[in-house]
Amino acid sequence: PYFFGIATKFEETMTQLGDRPKVRIIRMRKVPFIDSTGIHNLTALCEMSQKEKTTIILSGVNKNVHDVLEKAGFYELLGKENICPNINVALERAKSLVE
């Protein structure tokens, strides 16, 4: 689950990374649900990444998480083309952005 406890650790890890990549893929296949803190932190990461010119791609978002993110207006922030059904599609999307 992507909820309060893991959201803080995730945010800390993202801020400690060195070089800023052109694309960052976040694999969501093992995230059965997401709470409001998780949405807040994921949104903050996307906003920060936009400022740094890094594209965020989500991979493997299940229906429950998809519905929550959609209701929160998250897809307008990220762009539907950056929500991929699996890692292979996400990697192809990333490749198209860096070529």
Regions found by a protein language model. Give the residues of each.
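Structured cytosolic domains appended to multi-pass membrane proteins
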Residues: 1-99
